[in-house]
């Protein structure tokens, strides 16, 4: 991170800090927000604190459309909540690494500390001598600042090394879908097929439109097996080629 882009501002209260945070945010709305586990930790915490201390109307200012909505998702049998901020996309860099960082192989942990060391040879700053972040803040404020800066620097260096955020955007633009839909496959295929049909002057049925409740699809054709050896038989596993296919 360019030192000229680092600014330290001291506040007398959390209320002042959050007000200034909102002012900086709305002065130049981001199109994409990213970070490690940012969706279910940072966004959830920041928006919830703004609502609690400043009110929901102030929290709505985070959205260029002045609309936020809480959503919950079950992850590994545990319900996790976050906030959806209309008008911008939250691309969690941890999810991007899990989805597209396959060249680095399966990881024993997906904590930023481990991934940073696995990919870059760099870890988060250690503050174990202080017990917790509150003690670190009170006893060594400079290390506290450096600790937070290091997290941001690791994300930036991971992107320089892997270009995962760039890949997410490339898949989204190529598939004609939102950035979040680049993590799936159905939306990309639907968009690709839809645009091909339109180019061939064929109007496909609209999801939820007339005829949407015609019942379940019959499904694909499955040929009865013919036992024995057969020449010129080849099987292609296309699943492993996503999103390159």
Language-model features and meaning:
Residues 42-52, 239-245:
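Short active-site loop/helix that positions an aromatic residue
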Residues 131-245:
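Common nucleic-acid-contacting/processivity interface regions adjacent to the catalytic cores
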Residues 13-21:
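Well-ordered alpha-helical segments embedded in enzymatic catalytic cores
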Residues 47-57, 172-176:
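Short secondary-structure boundary/capping segments
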Residues 32-33, 59, 92-94, 228-229, ...:
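Phosphodiester-processing cores and adjacent nucleic acid-binding clamps
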Residues 3-8, 12, 43, 52, ...:
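Active-site-proximal helix-loop-helix substrate-binding element of RNase H-like nuclease domains
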Residues 21-45:
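Proline-aspartate-enriched helix->loop->beta-strand connector
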